[in-house]
Amino acid sequence: MENHLPNIFYFPNCVTTFPYRYTQKELDDMKPDERERFKYATFPIIKHRWSHAYVVKDNHVFKLNVETSKRLRRATPPTLSVPVSMNTMLREYITQDGTKISFECYSYLTCKKATSLHDLDDNAIRGLVEGGNRLQLFTNSVGSVKDTVGIFGNPNPFMKVPLKSLHPSMQCKIFESWIHHVPVVLTGDTGVGKTSQVPKLLLWFNYLFGGFVNLSTITFDVQEKPIVLSLPRVALVKLHSETLLTSLGFNEIHKSPVSLKFGNMQEQFVNTRFRRYGIVFSTHKITLNTLFNYSTVILDEVHEHDQTGDIIIAVCRKYIRKLDSLFLMTATLEDDRQRIEEFFTESVFVHIPGGTLFSISEAYVKNSNDSLNKFMYIEEEKRNLVNAIKTYTPPKQSSGIVFVSTVSQCDVYKQYLSERLPYKFYIIHGKIQNINDLLSDIYDNEGVSIIISTPYLESSVTVQNATHVYDTGRVYIPSPYGGREVFISKSMRDQRKGRVGRVKPGMYIYFYDVSELRPIKRIDFEFLHNYVLYSKVFDLQLPEDLFVKPTNMTRLRDVIEYIRSFNISDGVWTRLLSSYYIHILEYAKVYARGGQSAAALDSFERTGNLTDDALDAIKSLNMRAKIISHRKASTHTYALMCRLLFGVYAGKTFIAYHKRPLTGYITMITEHSFIPEY
């Protein structure tokens, strides 16, 4: 029974399971194995009710201080003996010598001297029922949603959740995986509640049973830690934490079991009274630096292969015994299953069945041009988009999402479509600051709204009234001092399609040949220095310990040698990585020196405000590029062909843009910005 979730501890989804208070009469009527279930209440009661409990004497009855509102002095506990009678109305036992003791006090004293759940008899179970009722621990298939008020100190009831992820059978499956302390790979289509419900379920399990070595040994020495849901972007941290808070009946984060962790957090997001058993929503960067502060680590959007996320996975495997549980959540295993099975040989795969709540139909619009003929392909694609939106139009008060690959394409497509269609057009991507205001306008629009977006909308924001997706099937993959546009992967297609079908039937219209879809190995497009630096911090062997290995091992070795040339010790690197963003590797030289220059550069990385001190610090790094040639790119812009003169990528040519036709040299400020050397 230790690895199985008793049904009285199901999370109350308020559809099939509700909070329930069990009476002593119901306990008497139960079969022995049904009564046994209540023994597991020992663990949450020890944590949340008995952690500061002691024995008092109230009107000649031994009780616990937590059972009475009276301020009574600590009493010497009685010697326990088997009760000879009981009063179920008063919830009291009477022993051979006439001592009266409450059911819960008897259970407390029994657990204090017991070492195993097997030591608890029916007399002890009665007190566990009383303590569990006070904590609202138990559930049943009957009850009221109103009874969820106060479970976590929440002022409002829990939300009703009919999703598959909180179905009792799925709760049992997830619990068994969690309690076995092995890596869990959780899959499920978009819309089954992976991100919105599974972390909430794991919070519930941690609240009940977290901090104990196993569920058979009784101990009052609880090593309780919070759990963490680690996400690749700040927008996701805010979105999913707000969703969970609301679903647990909270109006604000203060005094809730939820905490947020991301860079430059405003005071409104800080929970000053966070619970030890709670859940932290964190960006990958901060999770990596605080990884062992958590009992359960949940990594979401694993299929995206965010660089820091992949590093976390590598570190978790190296130190898996330091974690109680690891959950990797992904919409699809299309591209990753074989590697995960190789990387985590003891992993458990759990799939949440079912798709979105509503059906999603598909339509394919063929482009007659070869995608290699980019200009002709794009021109026909835009015409096809216009015709498709006319043919497959969202209903009034609904919206459609057009996926393009870049921010600049958002502007181009919006202008093209708005000149040919009578609908309201919006642009949403990661650089837009007022997304909530835009969503309010979209929801208030009585007509049809069309949103042009980058892959940002695949997961970062849920558009509640979206019914149609128009997918160009492309994504821009940045690379050091460049990048290129490629067709999306199967997992990205699934994510985009899953943006609809949540609140009403949806439609997915795609404008690409599915035979073009390929897995995207992002590590081959990335700066590799973070893999090298964190391998120093966590003693990883490269490339053996990496979750995804780069194709070009020579480049990895070049990065290792380049970092070695900085002459910065591993201890200093550890300090720098936990203190600074270090978006540009060379900035570490300034941070290692410290002083005013380091403070100014740090402020620039955090705020974008380039002061004279920060500029001087950057200039001291000699990050130069030579201008080879220039050409006019538009009315007010010139394209500068440049050759990089520093770092691992020295010799690489790239294009920069400026309002003037420059010659000579430029100094790189960031990967994408520079100042001319006049």
UniProtKB/Swiss-Prot annotation:
InterPro entries: DEAD/DEAH_box_helicase_dom (IPR011545), DNA/RNA_helicase_DEAH_CS (IPR002464), Helicase_ATP-bd (IPR014001), Helicase_C-like (IPR001650), NPH-II (IPR021892), P-loop_NTPase (IPR027417)
Domain Helicase ATP-binding: 175-351
Binding site for ATP: G188, D189, T190, G191, V192, G193, K194, T195
SMART domains documented for this protein: DEXDc (SM00487), HELICc (SM00490)
Upregulation: Expressed both early and late in the viral replicative cycle.
Record keywords: ATP-binding, Helicase, Hydrolase, Nucleotide-binding, Transcription, Virion
Motif annotated as DEXH box, chain positions: 300-303
Stretches assigned to the Helicase C-terminal domain: 371-546
Signal peptide segment: none
Top-level lineage group: Viruses
GO molecular function: ATP binding; ATP hydrolysis activity; RNA binding; RNA helicase activity
Cellular compartments annotated: Virion
EC number: 3.6.4.13
Gene Ontology CC, one term: virion component
Catalysed reaction, written as an equation: ATP + H2O = ADP + phosphate + H(+)
Regions annotated as coiled coil: none
Self-association state and partner proteins as the record states: Monomer.
Role of this protein: NTP-dependent helicase that catalyzes unidirectional unwinding of 3'tailed duplex RNAs and plays an important role during transcription of early mRNAs, presumably by preventing R-loop formation behind the elongating RNA polymerase. Might also play a role in the export of newly synthesized mRNA chains out of the core into the cytoplasm. Required for replication and propagation of viral particles.
Family recorded in the similarity comment: Belongs to the DEAD box helicase family. DEAH subfamily.
Protein name: RNA helicase NPH-II
Organism of this sequence: Rabbit fibroma virus (strain Kasza)
